[in-house]
Amino acid sequence: FYADVIDIGATTVVILAGTNDIAGNTGPMSIDMILNNLKSMTGIALANNVKVILCSVLPAYDYPWSPNKNPNIKIPKLNSKIKKYAKKSGVHYLDYFKALDNGNNGIDKEFSYDGVHLTLEGYKVLEPLLENALKKVTK
């Protein structure tokens, strides 16, 4: 985080993290462990006068490469905690989940080729949301 944000003199950071942790890509992690990582990054940013946009984790009904991790249940729980923390810490919360949720805590094929990774159309949904958040945070 230091090398990617602080050391380069960034004035704003967009933090979108957590789905790989829920999938267990680097080993098991609890929702609270993931939240603590996000809190650490946010705290470091704020301590260095970097504005923060804290994003929700994108919806995923399941992970094709790591089944039975229940992301459709865990991601909404994590997002609720992220939103609460963002409000408490005074940083902007960007709700990508709501924009892509197909009503089943997943993403439709139009927006994701595997239910996790976005297609160009998926990124087109997120782009105006991020642009709006950046305008609010950097004004």
Where are these predicted regions, by residue range?
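Alpha-helical cap/lid subdomain in secreted, periplasmic
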Residues: 1-139
